[in-house]
A protein has these predicted regions:
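A short, Lys/Arg-rich alpha-helix, primarily the initiator
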Residues: 1-18
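DNA major-groove recognition helix of helix-turn-helix
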Residues: 15, 41, 59, 70
């Protein structure tokens, strides 16, 4: 039976601590639409590796500080 996985993120929290940055501002800084940022935050869309790095760069953090990959009940870092 294949393991199920989930990618979660801390984008909303990072935006809050970045002077309450709007989704629109983050979208402009990363070259995507506000709707894309919203879908990523809600877990409805998994970003490409390139976009994930761009998001991390905007906040000045490592990619694994933004995104977390979970397999079933374990956390993979």
């Amino acid at each position: 039976m294949p393991k199920t996985y989930e990618i979660t993120n801390k984008i909303r929290t990072l935006r809050f601590f970045a002077n309450e940055m709007s989704q629109q501002t983050l979208a402009e800084l990363t070259g995507v639409s506000r709707q894309t940022i919203n879908a990523i935050e809600l877990g409805k869309y998994t970003p490409s590796l390139d976009l994930a790095y761009k998001i991390a760069h905007v906040f000045g953090v490592l990619i694994d500080e933004v995104f977390e990959y979970k397999i079933a009940n374990e956390i993979v870092k």
